[in-house]
A protein has these predicted regions:
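Glycine-rich phosphate/diphosphate-binding loop of Rossmann-like nucleotide-binding domains
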Residues: 1-34
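Short glycine/serine/threonine-rich phosphate/pyrophosphate-binding segments
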Residues: 6-11, 36-39, 58-67, 87-88, ...
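Glycine/charged-rich beta-loop-alpha catalytic/anionic-binding loops adjacent to active sites
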Residues: 23-24, 49, 74, 96-106
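N-terminal beta-loop-helix "entrance" segment that forms/cooperates
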Residues: 25-49
Length: 151
């Protein structure tokens, strides 16, 4: 996350979703603008620390996901944080990446945070059968909650 304020109401939902699947994860405050050395060190050690997917959330001039993607070959998922401009500034900063430096950008806010976790789970499910089974069960349960008729 780019700042501590990104946690409440947004990224806490990402973490809770990852916990539902038993996915071990770290939560850190790292800013592309204010703590670039911290970002470089984190990414330098990421693969050694067995990190397989990075979820980067930031608001306003949200460059965290893009800078992260430029410094690693690990999959980077970007979550734009809602802002005074309803998150549009964050969305555009996250999604508008040059060719060759991909960021998987999700929706603004809580929905994006939850979907970032689910996309990370999906990425990990390619390698880990137990994660795939949990994802299939989640999807099946999710489908059962949708009514067939409106009333």
């Amino acid at each position: 996350m780019g700042s501590k304020s990104d946690w409440l109401g947004t990224m806490e939902h990402c973490s809770n979703t990852l916990k539902q699947f038993g996915i071990k994860h770290e939560v850190r405050v790292i800013s592309a603008h204010r703590t670039p050395k911290r970002l470089h060190k984190f990414l330098k050690d990421a693969e050694k620390n067995k990190i397989e997917v990075i979820i980067a959330a930031a608001g306003m001039s949200a460059h965290l996901a893009g800078v992260t993607a430029s410094l690693t070959t690990l999959p980077v998922l970007g979550v734009p944080i809602e802002s005074k401009l309803k998150g549009l500034d964050s969305l555009l900063s996250t999604v508008q990446m040059p060719s060759g430096i991909p960021v998987g950008t999700l929706a603004i806010g809580k929905a994006g945070a939850i979907n970032a976790a689910l996309l990370a789970v999906s990425i990990l499910s390619v390698r880990y059968r137990d994660v795939l089974n949990k994802l299939r069960k989640y999807r099946s349960n999710f489908e059962k909650k949708v009514p067939k008729k409106p009333f």
